[in-house]
């Protein structure tokens, strides 16, 4: 009995989900409006702050192409960043590497998100948060959404704002600490970054509580 040869690739290749406004509309039906999205950038790097953003989109002026910032090119993120700032209510907060070292990265991230939400000029009735954890101490309702930056346009917008803001901060830090190449890797554990740390030791932006530095 002959067997049909299987195709080399699926007939219907996987397409990542595209964020929409469904969570926001559901909250509105429950009487919770305005709705903010919140996300952070920079949990994983060896250096620099973790940056959080909270965004309340204008439902009549949602920028086209919003998605998880990790799925976008730097050019796409920069363009959407400017569109978000021009059309939405935005607040940004950060926790420094020193703050991360005195607490931990999760607490520092959630605290930055809490401050970003509370910094909004328009008070949100509910905040949609990327991930499994809700920042403690919020003055509004909150809903954690796993992979929320690919499911909610509000969270996607927040992820873009946080990512672009942090990348710009690390590019500026490169001028102060030129030995580490922060403008190229934003503090992530690339080979170039690890080599620079081995050659020059850590600087004040490095997270000394992270594993590579614990033995120093």
Curated annotation (Swiss-Prot):
InterPro entries on file: RNase_HII, RNase_HII/HIII, RNase_HII/HIII_dom, RNaseH-like_sf, RNaseH_sf
Record's GO cellular component terms: cytoplasm; ribonuclease H2 complex
Reactions this protein catalyses: Endonucleolytic cleavage to 5'-phosphomonoester
Annotated PROSITE patterns: RNASE_H_2
Cofactor note: Manganese or magnesium. Binds 1 divalent metal ion per monomer in the absence of substrate. May bind a second metal ion after substrate binding.
GO biological process: DNA replication, removal of RNA primer; mismatch repair
CDD domains: RNase_HII_bacteria_HII_like
Any Pfam family the entry gives: RNase_HII
Reported cofactor(s): Mn(2+); Mg(2+)
Domain RNase H type-2: 33-216
EC number: 3.1.26.4
Keywords tagged on the record: Cytoplasm, Endonuclease, Hydrolase, Manganese, Metal-binding, Nuclease
Gene Ontology terms for molecular function: manganese ion binding; RNA binding; RNA-DNA hybrid ribonuclease activity
Enzyme class, spelled out: hydrolase
UniProt-annotated binding residues for a divalent metal cation: 39-40, 130
HAMAP family given in the database record: RNase_HII_B (MF_00052_B)
Function: Endonuclease that specifically degrades the RNA of RNA-DNA hybrids.
Name under which the protein is recorded: Ribonuclease HII
Protein source organism: Sinorhizobium medicae (strain WSM419)
Record lineage: Bacteria, Pseudomonadati, Pseudomonadota, Alphaproteobacteria, Hyphomicrobiales
Gene designation per UniProt: rnhB
């Amino acid at each position: 009995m002959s067997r049909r040869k299987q195709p080399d690739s699926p007939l219907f290749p996987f397409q990542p989900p595209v964020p929409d406004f469904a969570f926001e509309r559901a909250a509105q039906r429950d009487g919770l409006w305005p709705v903010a999205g919140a996300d952070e950038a920079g949990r994983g790097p060896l250096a620099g702050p973790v940056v959080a953003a909270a965004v309340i989109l204008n439902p009549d002026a949602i920028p086209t192409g919003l998605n998880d910032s990790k799925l976008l090119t730097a050019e796409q993120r920069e363009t959407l960043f400017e569109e978000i700032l021009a059309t939405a209510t935005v607040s940004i907060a950060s926790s420094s590497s020193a703050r991360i070292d005195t607490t931990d990265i999760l607490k520092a991230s959630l605290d930055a998100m809490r401050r970003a939400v509370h910094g909004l000029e328009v008070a949100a009735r509910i905040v949609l948060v990327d991930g499994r954890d809700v920042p403690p101490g919020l003055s509004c309702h909150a809903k954690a959404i796993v992979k929320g930056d690919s499911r909610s346009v509000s969270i996607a917008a927040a992820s873009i704002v946080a990512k672009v803001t942090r990348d710009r901060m690390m590019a500026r830090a490169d001028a102060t600490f030129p030995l580490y190449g922060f403008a190229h890797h934003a503090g992530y554990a690339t080979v170039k970054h690890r080599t620079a740390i081995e050659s020059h030791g850590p600087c004040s932006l490095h997270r000394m509580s992270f594993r590579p530095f614990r033995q120093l």
